[in-house]
């Protein structure tokens, strides 16, 4: 049986490293064709030595020489650098699936190229759908290529919808851990530090998504992602704070029945399901013990966690507004990680950026690129002026 050839965009990040573990556990089924990273050359080189891909790409061209030196004794591995190389590598003939595990707006262009090259997309880069959901879904339909969700919540919804055909969805119940500051007062939130925010209670994630989880912007982005993946309006998507992260999400149908997907918090499960769909494969992991897990659900506090409300506002407005929010969020997230922006200031800067960047109700790809640049500039200026 021919092994599926997989390209992992962002192999040194949290999702990428766990995807490599899945491939290693099922090496009889999957093979790594290509791995990519932005800056982490040492990690990328170590992965290349272990998995022997046909190619590696380092997005930061300044790290190319270092990567070349690290892999000097691996002549069979082709080494490329730059954003253009990312777009080109996903088009390589042997690739069957592309896992988009890179962070941020940078995931949009290679995803578009992969769809046009008729590759199955395993989508972990939520910003792609946040920024350009309509464009991506239209392309996927045009080229008849599936987009398989890797986010645990969207994988859960996808699994709940399996076998339901045209049965009408009444509501999507999107669960959120609530982050580490769920019970904080506004005064406590104002004093939150980077170190506080990077300690997530239930999931092991990269720095950017951990901060987004703490502000609940991550959940806002997942609402937008769900709208596009499942064709459900935002007003039919309800966010439930579920601190245990056992119920990964649920779907309520027109007869009132609710289907939920449960499991221990382990990102290998949704990654593996995207790789193996529609089949399920064994995974060596902890099993869910419902006797030791109480299940609690709460309404999110959108006054304390304003980013969630701003994301709903953006998707209702449509056009390039979600792109504006995403760009501003990338800037404030980095600003917070660099101690240049306070925890509560993040939502203030995003809100002001939303009102200051030109709105376009019918954006093209070029509009998204221009909007992204403008929103980043505006948000950065607001941080510098203490927006």
Where do the model's predicted regions map?
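Catalytic, metal-anchored helix/loop core of enzyme active sites in primary metabolism
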Residues: 1-387
């Amino acid at each position: 049986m021919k092994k599926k050839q997989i390209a992992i965009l962002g192999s040194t990040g949290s999702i990428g490293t766990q995807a490599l573990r899945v491939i290693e556990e099922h090496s009889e089924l999957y093979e790594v064709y290509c791995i990519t990273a932005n800056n982490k050359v040492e990690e990328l080189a170590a992965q290349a030595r272990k998995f022997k891909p046909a190619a590696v790409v380092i997005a930061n061209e300044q790290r190319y020489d270092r990567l070349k030196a690290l892999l000097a004794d691996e002549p069979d591995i082709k080494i490329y650098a730059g954003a253009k190389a990312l777009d080109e590598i996903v088009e390589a003939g042997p690739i069957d699936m592309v896992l988009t595990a890179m962070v941020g707006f940078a995931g949009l262009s290679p995803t578009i190229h992969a769809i046009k090259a008729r590759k199955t997309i395993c989508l972990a880069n939520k910003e792609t759908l946040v920024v350009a959901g309509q464009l991506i879904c239209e392309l996927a339909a045009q080229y008849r290529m599936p987009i398989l969700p890797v986010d645990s919540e969207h994988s859960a919804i996808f699994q709940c919808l399996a076998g339901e055909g045209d049965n009408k969805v009444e509501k999507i119940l999107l669960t959120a851990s609530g982050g580490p500051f769920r019970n904080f007062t506004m005064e406590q939130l104002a004093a939150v530090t980077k170190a506080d925010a990077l300690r997530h209670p239930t999931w092991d994630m990269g720095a950017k998504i951990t901060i987004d989880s703490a502000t609940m912007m991550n959940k806002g982005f997942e609402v937008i992602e769900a709208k596009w993946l499942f064709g459900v309006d935002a007003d039919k998507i309800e966010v439930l704070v579920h601190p245990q992260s056992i119920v990964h999400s649920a779907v309520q149908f027109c007869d009132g029945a609710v289907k939920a997907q449960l499991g221990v918090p382990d990102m290998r499960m949704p990654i593996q399901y995207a790789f193996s769909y529609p089949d399920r494969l064994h995974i060596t992991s902890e099993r869910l013990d419902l006797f030791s897990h109480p299940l609690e659900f709460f309404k999110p506090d959108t006054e304390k966690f304003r980013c969630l409300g701003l994301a709903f506002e953006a998707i209702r407005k449509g056009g390039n507004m979600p792109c504006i929010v995403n760009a501003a969020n990338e800037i404030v997230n980095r600003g917070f990680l660099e101690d240049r922006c306070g925890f509560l200031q993040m939502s203030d800067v995003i809100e002001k950026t939303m009102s200051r960047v030109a709105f376009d109700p019918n954006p093209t790809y070029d509009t998204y690129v221009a909007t992204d640049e403008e929103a980043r500039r505006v948000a950065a200026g607001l941080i510098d002026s203490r927006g």
